[in-house]
């Protein structure tokens, strides 16, 4: 796969917990530790009547690039409803007494807050797991939600870029 990637290319590899530690070592060997970008945790809610042990509610996706000039589009999530974001983003300055005050225009009006982009997405993604009766289901046993694939593709490519799905969409 490394051979066919452009110098700005990325690779995202999903793995279950049983072999993720082996895959990480292999990927470090192939792409180099310096091209490791992130270990994305895909978390979801599932219920089970398992009586012993911890219920697995996440999977791992390794994100590597071919070089340091990789393509990456930042995504933003909405601010928490309890965050007073207008106040946080408001421009401020110090008055003659050294006290921090909101900036005002020539007319004495408070200058509006900066653009609200949101919070950059972290490496923990909460995306619902496909339930067995979901309309999106294709019958493939390890199918991933389209929302998960969509986020990865939009994060690592632009419109018109070539994206390789080595499983030809059978899992999505």
Q: What are these model-derived regions, one by one?
A:
Residues 1-172:
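Core catalytic lobe of class I
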């Amino acid at each position: 796969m490394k051979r066919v990637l452009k110098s700005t290319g990325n690779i995202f590899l999903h793995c279950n917990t049983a072999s993720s530690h082996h895959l990480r070592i292999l990927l470090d060997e192939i792409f180099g530790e310096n091209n490791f970008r992130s270990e994305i945790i895909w978390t979801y809610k599932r219920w089970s009547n398992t009586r012993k042990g911890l219920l697995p509610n996440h999977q791992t996706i390794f994100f590597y690039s071919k070089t340091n000039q990789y393509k990456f589009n930042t995504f933003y999530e909405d601010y928490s409803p309890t965050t007073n974001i207008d106040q946080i983003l408001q421009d401020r300055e110090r008055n003659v007494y050294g006290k921090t005050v909101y900036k005002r225009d020539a007319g004495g009006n408070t200058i509006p807050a900066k653009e609200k982009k949101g919070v950059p997405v972290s490496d923990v993604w909460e995306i619902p797991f496909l339930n067995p009766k979901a309309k999106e289901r294709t019958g493939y046993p390890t199918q991933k939600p389209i929302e998960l694939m969509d986020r990865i593709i939009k994060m690592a490519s632009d419109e018109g870029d070539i994206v390789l799905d080595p499983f030809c969409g059978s899992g999505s």
